[in-house]
Swiss-Prot record:
Record's catalysed reaction(s): Na(+)(in) + 2 H(+)(out) = Na(+)(out) + 2 H(+)(in)
Gene: nhaA2
GO cellular component assignments: plasma membrane
Protein name: Na(+)/H(+) antiporter NhaA 2
Keyword flag Nucleotidyltransferase: no
Organism whose genome encodes this protein: Campylobacter jejuni subsp. jejuni serotype O:2 (strain ATCC 700819 / NCTC 11168)
GO-annotated biological processes: regulation of pH
Molecular function as annotated in GO: sodium:proton antiporter activity
Database matches in InterPro entries: Na/H_antiporter_dom_sf (IPR023171), NhaA (IPR004670)
């Protein structure tokens, strides 16, 4: 029993759990269990009363709801590190911002260069700009204490800025319409959170209440609802009025739910991609090449190059006691686009099979390549 407890509480176990549920989802989707798997996650669940109801399929409740809690955790960790930890220095926090910019601009340019002559294909230019923070973190968890905290923090920070960039891209280029009323309600909720923070109120139930209203308004606004988690994290106080740690305690309570329940469930719901109708030859189509080269090469080169230039111009600095060799390994992991890229793919091509699933296959290939190469590289490099 002690051995099982030790294994479950180890740093690598959450990563193993995530990988296990990823392959379980692929197995279910590509076997006789496919119909049961699809029906289960597409089953509608309705929450509400009288004239106010939210009805969504289970996979959307997970992707829009539970993942907002994951983003809340990441936001809390980032806030703590910026105010009290390793990112207090402006040059330290600017590094992931430059990395995120490079990781979005370079893949997009690669995709555009390959697909510029095909109007419909060009709708997918943003597909290789995304990083799946959940899976990238999962690979880091597998490496355990081999990766310094400062590098883990860099990846988390970069992925947040990257996902914020993705949310802006979705809002500007892939949202049919925005609801003005819902956005006004969002602003009122943000003002309420600001007041709670200003008066140093540490009743978690009040933050939950305002947070739920903010999440619903965000959902109805047309902006991706997971952004609500990041916004809430900005306003949770660091300490109580008696100067006792508060934010850290909230993070400690939420973290087990995220790593042992939310992330594995997210992997199981999203990794189920039917690869039976995909043809390996379609990997060499322009759309596929744009996605694969954009995610696998564009991401790592863009992140590293932008960071390197920023460091040389003294606009940012490399984390303490970290060499460029190890740093490059983290840059490789940013090419894991997986569920975030699949999400943008669905918005760009409206789930069309015009490319015979070559786009989805390319996302899988590039993401697995980035994960495997990044893992091996970080395992070898000292």
């Amino acid at each position: 029993m002690q051995m099982i407890k030790k294994m479950v509480l180890s740093e690598t176990f959450p990563g193993i759990l995530l990988i296990f549920f990823t392959f379980l989802a692929l197995l279910c989707k590509n076997s006789s269990l496919s119909v049961i798997y699809t029906d289960f996650f597409h089953a509608n669940f309705t929450v509400g009363f009288d004239h106010f109801q939210i009805s969504k399929s289970l996979d959307l409740w997970i992707n829009d709801g539970l993942i907002a809690i994951f983003f809340l955790c990441i936001g809390l960790e980032l806030k703590y590190e910026i105010l009290r930890g390793q990112l207090k220095n402006i040059r330290a926090v600017s590094l992931p911002i430059f990395g995120a910019l490079g990781g979005m601009i370079t893949p997009a340019l690669i995709f555009i260069a390959i697909n510029y002559s095909h109007d419909f294909a060009m709708k997918g230019w943003a597909i290789p700009t995304a990083t799946d923070i959940a899976f990238a973190v999962g690979i880091l968890m597998l490496l355990g204490n081999k990766i310094p905290t400062s590098l883990k923090l860099f990846l988390l920070s970069l992925a947040i800025f990257d996902d914020l960039g993705a949310i802006v891209i979705i809002a500007l280029f892939y949202t049919d319409q925005l609801s003005a009323l819902a956005i006004i309600i969002c602003l009122f909720c943000i003002f309420a959170l600001l007041l709670l923070n200003y008066y140093h109120i540490t009743h978690l139930s009040l933050y939950v209440l305002v947070g739920v209203v903010l999440w619903i308004a965000m959902l109805k606004s047309g902006v991706h609802a997971t952004l609500a988690g990041v916004i809430i994290s900005l306003f949770i106080p660091l300490d109580t009025k008696n100067k006792k740690p508060y934010l850290h305690e909230v993070l400690k309570d939420l973290n087990p739910w995220v790593v042992y329940f939310i992330l594995p469930l997210f992997a199981f719901a999203n990794a189920g991609i039917d690869i039976r109708d995909m043809h390996l030859g379609s990997v060499f189509s322009p759309v596929s090449l744009g996605i694969i080269l954009g995610l696998f090469l564009g991401k790592q080169l863009g992140v590293f190059t932008f960071c390197f230039i920023a460091i040389k111009l003294k606009l940012a600095k490399l984390p303490e006691n970290i060499k460029y060799g190890k740093f490059y390994g983290i840059c490789i992991l940013t090419g894991i686009g997986f569920t975030m890229s699949l999400f943008i793919d669905g918005l760009a091509y409206k789930n069309s099979d015009i490319f015979e699933y070559a786009d989805k296959l390319a996302i899988l290939v590039a993401s697995f390549l980035s994960a495997i190469v990044g893992f091996i590289y970080l395992k070898i490099v000292k």
